[in-house]
């Protein structure tokens, strides 16, 4: 069976955006689309039964949510094979399990009110940090901000030899017919003994060399752009992502925890990026 594009749905506006993105991604990759609703309704509402259907109320609601999502996906991409499922369990752990047999997972995430309005929900962060496949996260916000300057933005980290994120970004660029913009920030060493005469070389040139190495195996048909701004990596990526179609970042295994855990850069751009973000797990 072909690996599906899995979309987590809950009936919210961000999750419907995720359905749209998932349908497009499935069409681009020739993959089936799987729409999943997960909840602990059995634990909390087992005694509350929808009388006319003899089923828990939230299960009835869940079936309605996935039915609406299925109709939306079929309308958007009629040629894509669509299946649905309602799972009993914690949404984040259900979706991490789904990621083990998926080509990618797509999630929508709402902002919160007040001072934390730009922060992501725990489900998106948990899945992005522990999934076995790439995870697209679409934050709530004005959709017309996406794609004003259509391109795929790639965060080039300290380990360009870890090529999973590069390959994924290049695939997205090739499938969508968009340029690939590789970004690596740099900072000039500070202190009285860290000038150019100390032997460090030009930090911007070093950043360009790292980017060139990362892009070495990108297909010839993909146009590439290079951006090496001075400053903090997270801030540089958020700025580069303005108007972009997608920002791609890698996630690396970390010892002392379950599976992948997001580093500061990936965590930061998931909270702040003005466009969809794809988190791609790199092999250990």
Protein language model regions, located:
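Small/aliphatic-rich secondary-structure junction motif
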Residues: 1-52, 150-197, 216, 220-223
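Structural beta-alpha unit
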Residues: 1, 14, 53, 71-105, ...
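Intrinsically disordered or low-complexity boundary/linker segments at protein termini
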Residues: 1-17, 79, 103-109, 125-167, ...
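Acidic (E/D-rich), amphipathic helical modules within compact regulatory domains
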Residues: 25, 82, 92-97, 103-129, ...
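General small-molecule cofactor/ligand-binding pocket signal
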Residues: 34-36, 83-87, 136, 181-183, ...
């Amino acid at each position: 069976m072909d690996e599906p594009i899995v979309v987590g749905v809950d009936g919210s506006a961000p999750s419907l955006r995720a359905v749209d993105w998932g349908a497009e991604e499935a069409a681009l990759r020739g993959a089936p689309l799987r729409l999943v609703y997960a909840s602990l309704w059995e634990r909390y509402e087992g005694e509350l039964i929808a009388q006319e259907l003899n089923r828990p109320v939230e299960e009835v609601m869940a079936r309605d949510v996935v039915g609406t999502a299925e109709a939306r996906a079929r309308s958007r991409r009629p040629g894509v094979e669509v299946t649905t499922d309602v799972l009993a369990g914690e949404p984040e752990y259900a979706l991490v399990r789904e990621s083990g047999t998926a080509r990618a997972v797509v999630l929508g995430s709402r902002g919160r009110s007040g001072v934390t309005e730009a922060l992501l929900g725990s489900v998106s962060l948990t899945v992005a940090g522990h999934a076995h496949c790439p995870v697209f996260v679409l934050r709530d916000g004005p959709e017309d901000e996406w794609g004003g300057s259509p391109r795929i933005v790639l965060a080039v980290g300290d380990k360009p030899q870890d090529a999973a994120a590069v390959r994924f970004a290049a695939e997205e660029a090739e499938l969508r017919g968009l340029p690939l913009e590789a970004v690596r920030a740099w900072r000039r060493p500070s202190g009285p003994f860290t000038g150019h005469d100390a032997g460090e070389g030009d930090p911007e040139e070093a950043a360009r060399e790292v980017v060139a190495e990362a892009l070495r195996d990108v297909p010839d048909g993909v146009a590439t752009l290079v951006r090496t701004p001075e400053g903090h990596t997270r801030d540089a990526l958020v700025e580069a992502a303005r108007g972009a179609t997608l920002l791609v970042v890698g996630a690396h295994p970390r010892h002392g925890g379950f599976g992948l855990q997001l580093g500061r850069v990936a965590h930061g751009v998931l909270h702040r990026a003005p466009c969809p973000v794809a988190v791609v797990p790199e092999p250990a």
